[in-house]
Amino acid sequence: MILNCAIIDEDPEALQLLEQYIEKTPTLHLIGAYKSAIDAVDGIHHNHLDILFLAIHMQQISGLEFAKVVPKNVKIVFTTAFKEYAIEAYKVNAFDYLLKPITYDDFMGSCQKVFERYMQDDNYNPIKRDGFLVVKRDYKCVRIPIDDILFVDCSNSNDEPFIL
């Protein structure tokens, strides 16, 4: 399953760090990285988005205010250096709350929670939505377009799927 993400953060270092974490994670796809909530409006409302990494402190509009206009199906993960906003964040349907500086382990823990929530949804079909099958190959994950698969065979000796 590939989850589409976006980042909104005025801090260039925080933005770059989250971009690197997403690029490092084969099951995440970055739709956009924005320096303000205003810049992100079109990208968020015109793309299928699963996760939004959203800073709280921003100049034009706070992340807490912006969260109120984010589509309800999007999982919002707030990213901030201020733990005192946690209660307010959950009041606007935060899915998770990460304190800066964000480690890769914390980032992955949050993403894992999002994956698990989507997997619990009976109506969620990642192959139908994404159009890709993700398989492990030579110690990394590879995305294979569903339309390119002719058949899958698991009859070899070590029970690894053979995809053609």
Where are these regions (language model features)?
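Non-catalytic signal-transmission and effector/linker regions of two-component phosphorelay proteins
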Residues: 1-4
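Conserved binding/recognition cores within well-folded domains
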Residues: 112-164
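Conserved RecA-like P-loop NTPase ATPase core
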Residues: 18, 86, 149
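CheY-like receiver
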Residues: 13, 23-24, 37-124
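Short gly/ser/thr-rich secondary-structure transition/capping motifs
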Residues: 34-36, 57-58, 129-135
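Two-component/phosphorelay signaling modules centered on CheY-like receiver
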Residues: 11-32
